[in-house]
């Protein structure tokens, strides 16, 4: 029980900090919490329910689970949990599984297509239900893995934003767990004995690139525990004068009337390998530093 309280306090602090830093929850919000049956979404729902009890603003939560037609998906397990915690919920059924199987060649990972179809269903449901925001369970590790995936395999410096507006402008997606470490989420979910639904029911091939990046981060973290926290910290401490983006350079030059590159300090000889000082929490304001 002591471990549960310790982990809950830590995760509540990280979640509340992210909500404050990025204005993720507002007065009167009706927030759809996408609950897949995995550790991340169960934990997100629990934390938002706890924060709602003590928040100085009023907001509503509705949990939504989507059964996409994967063989053996235990929708009743998820529904029983949602009923037991006393949150309003909706169980949706859309056979996107057969669509994915038709579109994706045998042996290829189905995750990207499946994700887009799932997102479309949730977006439409949020509008129909009058939800102002959709909360997803992506955590710190998801953000830093995506940062490396984008840089290494796509040649772009980007990750998952803490909030975004959908392309059609109808939905706002928020990620309140963006400061939370995956190992804390996993430990909390295990301690709480959430009824976890496996994510491989569809039989899809694993995302090998993401798994490779995850292994790389694990190896680096074994040598330098602050690696993941530092990468998250880097996402909020961009130094434009030390990058090669000419469009960004032009925007800054137009805004300031100065050439950012000529104003850059010579930092090439500096040792950038030291972890942040303190107890492992670095304000972005807010993002978590080394663990």
UniProtKB/Swiss-Prot annotation:
The keyword Ribonucleoprotein does not apply. One of its GO terms (cellular component) is cytoplasm. Homodimer. The keyword Transferase applies. Its EC number is 2.8.1.-. Keywords: 4Fe-4S, ATP-binding, Cytoplasm, Iron, Iron-sulfur, Magnesium, Metal-binding, Nucleotide-binding, RNA-binding, Transferase, tRNA processing, tRNA-binding. [4Fe-4S] cluster binds at residues 111, 114, 202. Coiled coil: none annotated. A motif (PP-loop motif) lies at residues 36-41. Catalyzes the ATP-dependent 2-thiolation of cytidine in position 32 of tRNA, to form 2-thiocytidine (s(2)C32). The sulfur atoms are provided by the cysteine/cysteine desulfurase (IscS) system. This is tRNA-cytidine(32) 2-sulfurtransferase. GO terms for molecular function: 4 iron, 4 sulfur cluster binding; ATP binding; metal ion binding; transferase activity; tRNA binding. Belongs to the TtcA family. InterPro entries: Rossmann-like_a/b/a_fold (IPR014729), TilS/TtcA_N (IPR011063), tRNA_Cyd_32_2_STrfase (IPR012089), tRNA_thiolation_TtcA_Ctu1 (IPR035107). It is found in: Cytoplasm. Binds 1 [4Fe-4S] cluster per subunit. The cluster is chelated by three Cys residues, the fourth Fe has a free coordination site that may bind a sulfur atom transferred from the persulfide of IscS. Its cofactor is Mg(2+); [4Fe-4S] cluster.
